[in-house]
Regions:
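A cross-family signal for N-terminal binding/gating loops and helix N-caps
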Residues: 1-174
Length: 174
């Protein structure tokens, strides 16, 4: 079984979460990201696709892109657009699309368990994209994206999650 661990998240300020929330970086190109983030200085795309704040002809893998991501992340934190939790947590995430709810958790997983096969890959990622995201993590000193990991149904996990959701208010409703 894979190991998960809590962490101190850097999360959107609850008063502007709708302005910060953005689609994953890999479902749009730079031009689309520029259009989506236009007029919204709070969009997380300024961090995840920071090339939108640079010359449109810049090489996506230029060091300036990673430096801009870090600069934007630091500015978001300074302005409290993003705030860091005081204690480590495992976060419950519920998403409703087309009337169907999906519930999961957000936690840290082991890179070693991913490499040794304990956690199985569910998709092929092009090497240049892996290098890009590795650099992004290194420059930002933060993992700004999530990786979907599924597990075989375990009633005990469902019970823990459901009990928590039944007895606590959500941080965000969007």
């Amino acid at each position: 079984m894979a190991t998960i661990k809590p962490f101190k998240a850097i999360r959107p300020n609850k008063y502007i979460v709708d302005k910060v929330a953005a689609l994953p970086y890999d479902v749009m190109n730079s031009k689309e990201a520029r259009r989506i983030a236009e007029g919204n200085p709070y969009s997380f795309l300024h961090i995840d696709k920071s090339e939108i704040d640079l010359d449109e002809n810049i090489d996506l893998y230029d060091e300036k892109v990673y430096l801009k991501a870090r600069e934007n992340l630091d500015e978001f934190r300074k302005q409290e657009i993003l705030v860091k939790d005081d204690k480590e947590c495992i976060y419950i995430y519920k998403q409703i699309m087309d009337g169907r709810a999906q519930v999961g958790i957000v936690a840290c997983i082991s890179v070693d368990e991913s490499l040794n096969g304990t956690i199985k890959k569910h998709e092929y990622t092009r090497p240049e994209k892996e290098i890009d995201r590795t650099k992004h993590i290194k420059y930002c000193d933060a993992n700004t994206g999530t990786i979907l990991v599924t597990y075989k149904h375990q009633r005990m996990i469902d019970d823990i999650i459901n009990d928590f959701m039944d007895n606590n208010e959500p941080l965000y409703i969007s």
